[in-house]
């Protein structure tokens, strides 16, 4: 048995090149060791191969293989000289002919679509301009009367930039069905044919959903929920849960979400004591045009009950789901939904922690800019719902600042919580929080090791310090002014009574003047003829 190898071949637009091998048993591909890729080897049995085509590709020439059950396989990077050898090997091993296909290079953006077995082909002048494998399409939506939008899967293993959305303008109408209507006139029955027309865009959308397997997933749904209210994105959707993904079917939009896209599941009682919220954090997010939805917010009435049984056989349940799900449920709808999501996604269900508000609730009402919602201080993060939904882990918070802004009565009743995030200059500000919740939130943040700055307490402390300093300054001034009186009352340590050095009249008002003093006074009268000085007026 002779094998034929081709080097530097890229499988389905992969980042890394590899080796392609053709053998009698089938076709295989393996990433080269030098690329450092962790991709698993790809094997395609010969019985899966239907037809093959040869055309220009992005890295040279491309081999496209149509299969029975594995979609279309793209192998890019061949040289022009490889065509002859490749054709011989495919004929010898698989008994298929290698068709040479030329692409249209006119550059027109109008043409005809061909919904083939494994891919959508856009033809211009009867030549393919491009092909879109159905496996690359994640969602399709009728965004207007004549417009259909396609959303594509994001694959981190592909090289370079990726297209994420494409829209087709499909004008016109199509006669769909003819209905016979019977009318009675004067006792006679008259049959009239009524032609039902639908838009061409609607027809294209329905056909694409069937071909691309968007509207339904292969196999039966394990569990289904109908008419579930979504706050984000707004609307009501039917939810079908399958082994590896779930479907959201609404009036306008349909979505397919892989369980691996779901990163976190929150189950939170709404502080209004009437509703319960389930929040799904997904990556990559859902898209509606240019709008991205990284969080899905579901709302349930607390008293609503659901009774259901899983749509799986007893054997499959015992083998696959026994440790994750229950066979039957009879409980509030939000509890059933949470348990099913946790079991199928194998993600932890995040519920309220130790925080309780003044009214013994898990969250507090507040506002983000002009949007009202609820802030939930959970064990590891702040979560604000509903719009915009904000997820802030405590590990990413540098500090929180509590402050009151504005004036008047309202300022004394509410406060603002400013959350500063590490590496960001734009804080998250939650305003209009009830003033009575400040103590509860502050103590909870300190328990979680979050640095808290209370501007009101800081201002009061500064004011008290300033008043204390001012009082100390006043005491010092009073002490300086009272020092003279203290000196009069203190005993003079230099004074010695009975000492000869002390003159009696200096200390005794009754002492007689000495003779020396009399002589000095007489001399001064004789020598000083100047007029006496005037006394200063007080």
UniProtKB/Swiss-Prot annotation:
* Bridged cysteine pairs (disulfide): none
Which CDD domains does the record cross-reference, listed alphabetically?
PH1_SSRP1-like, PH2_SSRP1-like, PH_TFIIH
The keyword RNA-binding appears for this protein: no
Provide the GO biological process annotations: cellular response to starvation; DNA repair; DNA replication-dependent chromatin assembly; DNA-templated DNA replication; filamentous growth; filamentous growth of a population of unicellular organisms in response to biotic stimulus; filamentous growth of a population of unicellular organisms in response to starvation; nucleosome organization
Which GO terms of the molecular function aspect are on file? DNA binding; histone binding; nucleosome binding
Subcellular localization: Nucleus; Chromosome
Q: Name one GO cellular component term.
A: chromosome, telomeric region
SUPFAM superfamilies annotated for this entry?
Answer: PH domain-like
Provide the alphabetized UniProt keywords: Chromosome, DNA damage, DNA repair, DNA replication, Nucleus, Transcription, Transcription regulation
Basic and acidic residues composition-biased segments: 522-531
Acidic residues bias: start-end ranges: 470-494, 502-521
- Please give the residue ranges the record annotates as the region Disordered: 467-538
Instruction: Relay the record's extra comment.
Output: In contrast to the orthologous protein in animals and plants, this protein does not contain a HMG box DNA-binding domain. This function may instead be provided by the HMG box of the associated NHP6 protein in the FACT complex of fungi.
> Which PANTHER family does the record associate with it?
FACT COMPLEX SUBUNIT SSRP1 (PTHR45849:SF1)
Q: What does this protein do?
A: Component of the FACT complex, a general chromatin factor that acts to reorganize nucleosomes. The FACT complex is involved in multiple processes that require DNA as a template such as mRNA elongation, DNA replication and DNA repair. During transcription elongation the FACT complex acts as a histone chaperone that both destabilizes and restores nucleosomal structure.
- Quaternary assembly: Forms a stable heterodimer with SPT16. The SPT16-POB3 dimer weakly associates with multiple molecules of NHP6 to form the FACT complex.
Family the entry assigns = Belongs to the SSRP1 family.
- Protein name (Swiss-Prot/TrEMBL): FACT complex subunit POB3
Protein source organism: Candida albicans (strain SC5314 / ATCC MYA-2876)
Gene of origin? POB3
